[in-house]
Regions:
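Rhodanese-like catalytic fold shared by cysteine-dependent sulfurtransferases
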Residues: 2-6, 15-48, 54-90
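Structural scaffold elements adjacent to functional motifs in cytosolic proteins
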Residues: 8-10
Length: 90
């Protein structure tokens, strides 16, 4: 079987996202609380997710939450966008 396409998930605020993001990232703000969980639950649980924020703290929380919700393949991009050496869309 083919590997599902990984999803890049940015859990920062919309303002932070608009100031620069990793290509193809989708933005769901962790700080929305219940709204975050609601939106996360609409995603495909079978896909791998690469989760990032500014420095890695919020994404670590998001990864834990997603695992609790049944997402099996979630990865925290350590160091966040600050440490990201790839392309950033501004």
């Amino acid at each position: 079987t083919e590997q599902p396409e990984p999803v890049v998930l940015d859990v920062r605020t919309e303002e932070e996202f608009e100031s620069g993001y990793i290509p193809n990232a989708i933005n769901i703000d962790l700080r929305m609380g219940p709204g975050f969980i609601e939106q996360i639950n609409t995603l495909d649980k079978n896909k791998p997710y690469y989760v990032y924020c500014r420095s890695g703290a919020r994404s670590a929380q998001a990864v834990q939450l997603m695992r609790d919700l049944g997402f099996n393949e979630t990865y925290n991009l350590l160091g966040g966008i600050l440490e990201w050496e790839g392309e950033v869309i501004e």
